[in-house]
Amino acid sequence: MEPKDFKVIIIGGSVAGLTLALSLNKIGIDYVVLEKRAHIAPQEGASIGILPHGGRILEQLGLFEAVERSIEPLHTAHIRFPDGFEYTTASPSVLNDRFGLPLAFLERQKMLQILFDAQTEKSKILCGKKVTKIEDFEESMTVYTEDGSTYTGDLVVGADGVHSQVRTEMWRLAEKMQPGIVSNTEKSSMTVQYTCVFGISAAVPGLVPGEQVASFNDKRSFLTFPGKNGRVFWFLINRLDQEHSYSSAPRFSMKDTETICHQFLEDIIYGDVRFNDLWSRKEVCSVTALEEGAFRTWSYRRIVCIGDSMHKMAPNTGQGANCAIEDVAALANMLHACVVTTERHCKPTTKELSTLLEGYTKRRFHRIKKIYQASRLVVRLQARETLLLRMMGRYYIPRSGDVPADVASKMIAGAVALDFLPIPSRSGPGWISFKTMESRLRYWIVGGAIPVLLIMSMWLWQVVL
């Protein structure tokens, strides 16, 4: 069997889908990308952060140089609290030194354009293809689109985001063939407790390119990333009055965006900069509910879902796109081993492919679960959700030295890369050294933060009594 005899149908032409297309192209596996939008890189006001583990994979694919031309590398982080206390850390530079790649922040539209421009077979990237149904024909899959087209292949990959049609179809087929295999508890596990207003503004005096700012406030936080030519990418993450299930989450309009933002125009971002300085200079902005969840069941037979369709996180840790890129690398590695390097004379059977995908899911979920839990903690820490989190954010973290950078380094170092392409020569020593730091980091976290919280708890208990 030749690799080109195996065909992958990729649903979704965003970061994960286009990265997977490039990866499959490198190993000679056939594919088609079906994107429901009319254009591959629309301007929606969104931005994207690329951390070293995502950047390393993009570098393997020959893309990171184009990313670097579009960014102002982050080197400094400022943190502000509502009592006026501010502190500065060199964590972005520390991570750059450890891993050889800068923290990059750019327009999502630009990132998508870079990914599309790199495609050598653009005829395989099809827009205006909204998927309506997927059918399992035992040893092949057929995808149906709204315009009446059909596409048949050996594997369907859902890279179609948090509102994934592929996930819905996977659950439908699983219930039809093996009732109860995906529990209702899992299906309803995604929740919404925060909204996110995100935008891009013209340069603001006082916000310096390469210096990110996190402004902690009660029940909300601001994240700002001044980039190339001073343009500022920003997020306002605001806690809702109650937690909603995914199916009952509120939907927002542009009018809602203004209503939310006008409440906080006088909030200080950093120094003398107020949120109104960003709002009055905005070029584009939008609002969305922030879904949070990490599903356990990523695959069924010849369908697998990746990226936001399986794990959705708040943007505070910047892990969303990077985890999706990692998913792609791990899946491409699996397909390379299964289809390309083995001397087999026929395609993998449904049973063989299903077993491989179950192993893929188990490995990815083991890693994603930890990152997802960290993301949940950080968004609540920055929104000062509880008294203990307020105390930890205000008093422990500013005095914890490089511990936050060490924790981030451990997460980065544990990432997968494409094993069929060379590791970039610019990789730093952190990829190896921080893979061996798990026990040491656990000591710092348990031996540092937990006792501090216990002491605070005892003090608060005495005050109450």
Swiss-Prot record:
Deletion consequences: Abolishes the production of 15-deoxyoxalicine B.
GO terms (BP aspect): terpenoid biosynthetic process
GO molecular function: FAD binding; monooxygenase activity
Protein source organism: Penicillium canescens
Gene name of the encoded protein: olcE
Cofactor(s) annotated in UniProt: FAD
Name the UniProt record assigns to this protein: FAD-dependent monooxygenase olcE
Keyword Transmembrane belongs to the record: yes
Pfam families in alphabetical order: FAD_binding_3 (PF01494)
GO annotation, cellular component aspect: membrane
Misc note: The 15-deoxyoxalicine B cluster is a rare cluster that contains its own geranylgeranyl pyrophosphate synthase (olcC), in contrast to other related clusters which rely on a FPP/GGPP synthase localized outside of the cluster.
Protein task: FAD-dependent monooxygenase; part of the gene cluster that mediates the biosynthesis of 15-deoxyoxalicine B. The first step of the pathway is the synthesis of nicotinyl-CoA from nicotinic acid by the nicotinic acid-CoA ligase olcI. Nicotinyl-CoA is then a substrate of polyketide synthase olcA to produce 4-hydroxy-6-(3-pyridinyl)-2H-pyran-2-one (HPPO) which is further prenylated by the polyprenyl transferase olcH to yield geranylgeranyl-HPPO. Geranylgeranyl pyrophosphate is provided by the cluster-specific geranylgeranyl pyrophosphate synthase olcC.
Annotated InterPro entries: FAD-bd, FAD/NAD-bd_sf, FAD_mOase_fung
Binding site for FAD: E35, G49, R108, D308, A321
Transmembrane portions of the chain: 9-29
EC number(s) recorded for this UniProt protein: 1.-.-.-
Membrane association type: Single-pass membrane protein
KW Transmembrane helix (keyword) present: yes
